[in-house]
Curated annotation (Swiss-Prot):
InterPro entries: Ribosom_uL1_bac-type, Ribosomal_uL1, Ribosomal_uL1-like, Ribosomal_uL1/biogenesis, Ribosomal_uL1_3-a/b-sand, Ribosomal_uL1_CS. Part of the 50S ribosomal subunit. This is Large ribosomal subunit protein uL1. GO terms for biological process: regulation of translation; translation. The keyword Repressor applies. Keywords: Repressor, Ribonucleoprotein, Ribosomal protein, RNA-binding, rRNA-binding, Translation regulation, tRNA-binding. GO terms for cellular component: large ribosomal subunit. Belongs to the universal ribosomal protein uL1 family. PROSITE patterns: RIBOSOMAL_L1. It comes from Gemmatimonas aurantiaca (strain DSM 14586 / JCM 11422 / NBRC 100505 / T-27).
């Protein structure tokens, strides 16, 4: 921990504290400051001018990151009949209703669950297990659908879900430190464009209040929010 503390401080010295950088500069700086021995995730933290206590100011949605997430997503599809083959052909890792019992028994070796609407009655019984882990299928996220082929392809191809927390912040990954700068820039733009479009009509005043970017272990860099106003 002491060594990591020194590395963190050394990395922090490469940025100008209190300065807001253009996105391109900030991304380059985050890549430069990354010091962990593993391929760190590059994460965005956005503070929004909303009050999530009011239902009409909750910001949530999905976006397909053009350059992907850098993570191999394990996709589970709960479906029957022809939808089983459709999901398998689309590349799902696990398919079938038998996995519901496995989940009840403690199995959770997947990252995304997709379900056809007719299966949600059974899946709802697993809410206490799936909900806190962010694994519950949701129509708004496109994971409750009869078009399982599209849902699987999107999940495998870089689709992420975001939701504002109680403090008015959105946290989301945009790739890995090993990504090329232009890949991270493209993913960042896709995320920001989606969040800007998701501004609630009830939100008043400045919407995008602060944006910071960091690697998993590295210090944060503030991004200039002027382009998003």
């Amino acid at each position: 921990m002491k060594t990591n503390g020194k590395k963190f401080r050394a990395a922090s010295e490469q940025r100008v504290l209190g300065k807001s950088y253009e996105a391109k500069q900030a991304i380059a700086l985050v890549k430069q400051m990354a010091f962990a021995k593993f391929d760190e995730t590059v994460e965005i933290a956005i503070r929004l001018g909303v009050d999530p206590r009011h239902a009409d100011q909750v910001v949530r949605g999905t976006v397909v990151l053009p350059a992907g997430t850098g993570k191999t997503m394990r996709v589970l599809v709960i479906a029957t009949g022809a939808k089983v083959q459709e999901a398998q052909e689309a590349g799902a890792d696990f398919v079938g209703t038998e996995f519901l019992q496995k989940i009840k028994d403690g199995w959770l070796d997947f990252d995304v669950m997709i379900a056809t609407p007719d299966q949600m009655g059974q899946i709802g019984q697993l809410g206490r297990v799936l909900g806190p882990r962010g694994l519950m299928p949701n129509p708004k996220a496109g994971t409750v659908t009869f078009d399982v082929s599209k849902a699987v392809r999107e999940s495998k191809g870089g689709k992420i879900e975001f939701r504002v927390d109680k403090g008015g912040n959105v946290h989301a990954p945009i790739g890995k430190v090993s990504f090329a700068p232009d890949q991270l820039e493209t993913n960042f733009s896709a995320l920001m464009d989606t969040i800007v479009r998701a501004k609630p009509a009830a939100a008043k005043g400045l919407y995008i209040r602060n944006v910071a970017i960091s690697s998993s272990m590295g210090p944060g860099v503030t991004i200039d929010t002027t382009p998003f106003r």
